Amino acid sequence: MLRVIYTIFLVLFFANANANSTLDRVLKDGELRVGTTGDWDPMSMKDPATNKYKGFDIDVMRELAKDLGVKVKFVPAEWKTIVAGITADRYDISTSVTKTPKRAEVAGFTTTYYKYGTVPLVLKKNLKKFATWNSLNNKDVTIATTLGTSQEEKAKEFFPKSRLKSVEAPARDFQEVLAGRADGNITSSTEANKLVIKYPQLAIVPDGEKNPAFLAMMVPKGDKTWNNYVSKWINDKKNSGFFKTLLTKYNLKSL
């Protein structure tokens, strides 16, 4: 009962702060529109058989909608256009994305709730050849990236000598490695740990993680009322143990 009263208090407080906020519209429409790619295991995955979403971020968004007292609607998005979806008002919020200066130019970010490192993936049979980050930085090496991801930008920084090959979703960079069309790719340590289990022919380069990065939800830039509400909600959920429970559920460990 106390939780319900507290949630109502938060909603009324922030909604009254700015009647033109996304928060006010979400409450008025009774629906939270969430942009998500559905291709990032275990954060957001779309089951092609049922067209339903599941994952860490999906559970987070369902909980947010529940506390707001509204329905949740997942809007399909692609990495190359996920930022544009926020600016074009196709959705009210996104599932987690990496906070980058480029994205922050046009979109707002909530407080962060997950931190990860970046690692390279190669074929296990090539692990002796590509045992370090530096071994992949070679003019004879092809590094695959997925168009629009933060890893696409990181690859340019980490591998200036290598050939970079961008693929467009629904294709994924690691699939190029599996098919032998690329020597490696980089991804979050979170996804990499899942991929090497799902595809035992892949291996993580054992040279350590680089570039610690933070995940957050994207919201419309300049909408402080909506951003403040969601950020306050995230912090409250951290304190309540909600995120800790989800980390255990999905066998994750934030840095």
Which residues does each PLM region occupy?
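Extracytoplasmic small-molecule ligand-binding "clamshell" domains
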Residues: 20-97, 105
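Periplasmic-binding protein-like
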Residues: 38, 115-119, 189, 193-235, ...
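A ligand-binding cleft/hinge motif common to bilobed small-molecule-binding domains
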Residues: 81, 97-105, 153-157, 175-211
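Short helix-initiation/N-cap motifs at beta->coil->alpha
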Residues: 58-59, 73-84, 165-179, 211-213
